[in-house]
């Protein structure tokens, strides 16, 4: 049980995929202008990351490894992620058409989010078992959601602030992301996995 808690703390805070490992920066910068959009993207990414982590583990352990075709893991994981994203897109379209319209192009772009593929590949590299793979994916998703939500809230406040002309737009966003990354580096050494 303690090991599972350490995996969650490690993926959420210590080894955050966006601010420490620099994976998933495209949706981080692209969807963070409004808090509502960021929350929707966070929920969709959490669902996709957790489910694709599970499906990728199963595909590797019960299809690729027994057949000696481990070299196909990247292509297989991309296909698995694409299927999970399509499933998520259909669910969101049926349950929340407004959220579906707000997310727009960013929902299909979860397929190419390097954090999703990175989690699947790191699960295999770390030789995580079934439960550890699910928790690793869920923790990475919660960490992504936490950072995206905090960053979008800060960007909304910055948009209302008096920012010097050269720093408006993407420049102040990058500075803010850098400061957040430095803050998360303070968690280094908290958990050693």
From Swiss-Prot:
Family per record: Belongs to the NqrDE/RnfAE family.
TM ranges: 5-25, 38-58, 65-85, 102-122, 134-154, 171-191
Listed PANTHER family: INTEGRAL MEMBRANE PROTEIN OF SOXR-REDUCING COMPLEX (PTHR30335), ION-TRANSLOCATING OXIDOREDUCTASE COMPLEX SUBUNIT A (PTHR30335:SF0)
Superkingdom of origin: Bacteria
Example of a GO cellular component annotation carried by this entry: plasma membrane
Gene Ontology biological process terms, A to Z: electron transport chain
Record's subcellular location: Cell inner membrane
Subunit structure: The complex is composed of six subunits: RnfA, RnfB, RnfC, RnfD, RnfE and RnfG.
Gene: rnfA
Enzyme class, broadest EC rank: translocase
Keyword Metal-binding carried by entry: no
Membrane among keywords: yes
Family annotation (InterPro entries): Ion_transpt_RnfA/RsxA (IPR011293), NqrDE/RnfAE (IPR003667), NqrDE/RnfAE_oxidrdctase (IPR050133)
Record's protein name: Ion-translocating oxidoreductase complex subunit A
Main location as per UniProt: membrane
One Pfam family this sequence matches: Rnf-Nqr
Record function comment: Part of a membrane-bound complex that couples electron transfer with translocation of ions across the membrane.
Membrane topology: Multi-pass membrane protein
Keyword entries, A-Z: Cell inner membrane, Cell membrane, Electron transport, Membrane, Translocase, Transmembrane, Transmembrane helix, Transport
EC annotation from Swiss-Prot or TrEMBL: 7.-.-.-
